[in-house]
């Protein structure tokens, strides 16, 4: 059960990041998706989705590696 939960924790932010990359790519090529009225709004939303997904993924990996004591001294808790 815990492995399934860990997989979901990694897949959901990964999908959000992938959506962000897709929105930024569509903005670059000038394709507007339905809920967005302007390209700049679509590009900004894509960047925000990508940043949030990457933040959650990186935080989860750092938390897991800290727990296993596999990080460099600079990232260890004080």
Curated annotation (Swiss-Prot):
Say which species the protein is native to: Bacillus subtilis (strain 168)
Where located? Cell membrane
Tell me how this protein sits in the membrane: Multi-pass membrane protein
- Tell me where on the tree of life, at the top rank, the source sits: Bacteria
Looking at the UniProt record for this protein, which Gene Ontology cellular component terms does it annotate, in alphabetical order? plasma membrane
Cysteines paired by S-S bonds: none
Note the Pfam families from the entry.
DUF2627
Q: What is this protein called?
A: Uncharacterized protein YqzF
Kindly report the protein's main subcellular placement as a broad class: membrane
Q: So where does this one cross the membrane?
A: 5-24, 39-61
- Keyword field: Cell membrane, Membrane, Transmembrane, Transmembrane helix
Q: Tell me if Membrane is a UniProt keyword of this record.
A: yes
Q: What is the lineage of its organism?
A: Bacteria, Bacillati, Bacillota, Bacilli, Bacillales
């Amino acid at each position: 059960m815990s492995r399934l939960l860990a997989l979901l924790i990694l897949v959901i932010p990964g999908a959000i990041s992938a959506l962000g990359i897709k929105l930024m790519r569509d903005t670059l090529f000038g394709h507007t998706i339905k809920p967005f009225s302007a390209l700049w709004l679509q590009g900004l939303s894509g960047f925000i989705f990508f940043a949030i997904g990457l933040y959650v993924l990186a935080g989860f990996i750092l938390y897991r590696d800290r727990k296993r004591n596999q990080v460099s001294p600079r990232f260890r808790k004080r």
